[in-house]
Regions:
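Long, contiguous binding/interaction regions
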Residues: 1-60, 68-80, 84-110
Length: 110
């Protein structure tokens, strides 16, 4: 297992009218709520220690400090939760997509 930080970026399509972007507070709340079940729950699929969500102009950066077997698996688990939350609110997130950012390994036992 490793303690690592993963970054995931959520983006609106490039041709989206900026006037139709959801409010930053809505983006932050929606994405934070998607990850909340993993936070502070050691028995979850991916224990998330802390999570920061930074919305910016039709996009958001999600940074999660977590404990997991690999950066790839951590990114996949978090991305699946974000994707489900965005699909649950299609009026706000129609056409949005996710991109993996950097993975930082802080400590590993292997």
């Amino acid at each position: 297992m490793a303690v690592l930080t993963v970054e995931i970026f959520a983006h609106a399509p490039e041709d989206t009218d900026p006037d139709t972007f959801p409010p930053d507070a809505f983006i932050e709340t929606t994405l934070r709520d998607a990850i909340a079940p993993l936070t502070g729950t050691p028995e979850s699929a991916l224990p998330v220690l802390t999570c920061a969500i930074t919305p910016y102009g039709g996009a958001a950066m999600v940074e999660a400090l977590c404990v997991g077997p690999s950066g790839e698996e951590a990114t996949d688990v978090i991305a699946a939760r974000l994707e489900a939350a965005m699909q649950d609110t299609p009026d706000a997130f129609e056409g949005w997509h996710l991109h993996a950012g950097c993975t930082h390994v802080h400590m590993s036992d292997n």
